[in-house]
Design a protein with these regions (language model features):
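Short, glycine-biased loop/turn motifs at secondary-structure junctions and
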Residues: 1-221
Length: 221
């Protein structure tokens, strides 16, 4: 089995990101087809047949550089395949909420958590990865992107994007975006967006947006 194929089935396997390369997160349907019917490989090299570097959508392969961008541009269907593509960083063209690139190498194809975990291992510090999970220890800070989950230890700060879940320990602060859930420990502050749920411990403050539910512990607000 090739190294790439092995990584596909075991994203935790040690992977060394070459100099000048970056990782792009993207999704395909169960048949590995993208919008418009472009066929992606399960692993290995892939290229766009009609590449155009102009900063407009189309004429390129598309995805979220380091997993950052518009979470509405990936598929959240249960059958969706999540891919990690190694690309030339300098070749990426910034678009609205995503990037496009001429070619790359698929190094992972599988589930969301496997893909986002692989990206997180190599992404710049503080990167908010769409669909990812971020966990920090005591005094730490955890930030997750759209639909992600962020958990921080005591006195930490946890922030999750839209539809995400944020949980902070004692004296922590948890903030979740639209439709998210935020839970903070004693003396913490929990803030959830519209339709979210915010729960704070003793002496905490819980704030929920429209249609949300806010629950604060003893002496809380």
């Amino acid at each position: 089995m090739s190294d790439t194929a092995s990584q596909q089935h075991n994203p935790a396997q040690l992977y060394c990101l070459p100099d000048g390369k970056a990782l792009v997160l993207r999704t395909c349907n169960a048949e590995l087809q993208a919008h418009g019917g472009f066929q992606w490989p399960e692993s290995g090299p892939v290229s766009c047949p009609d590449w155009d570097p102009k900063p407009k959508c189309g004429n390129g392969l598309h995805g979220l550089l380091w997993g950052q961008g518009d979470g509405d541009l990936v598929s959240w269907n249960a059958e969706a395949k999540w891919m990690v593509v190694e690309v030339e960083a300098a070749a990426c063209v910034e678009l609205s909420g995503k990037v496009k690139f001429p070619s790359g190498t698929v190094i992972f194809c599988g589930d969301r958590l496997g893909a986002t975990a692989l990206v997180a291992q190599h992404a710049p510090a503080g990167t908010s990865i769409v669909g990812g999970t971020a966990t920090a220890g005591t005094w730490g800070t955890a930030t997750a992107g759209y639909s992600g989950t962020a958990t921080a230890g005591d006195r930490g700060t946890a922030t999750a994007g839209d539809s995400g879940t944020a949980t902070a320990g004692d004296r922590g602060t948890a903030t979740a975006g639209y439709s998210g859930t935020a839970t903070a420990g004693d003396r913490g502050t929990a803030t959830a967006g519209d339709e979210g749920t915010a729960t704070a411990g003793d002496r905490g403050t819980a704030t929920a947006g429209t249609w949300g539910t806010a629950t604060a512990g003893d002496r809380g607000t």
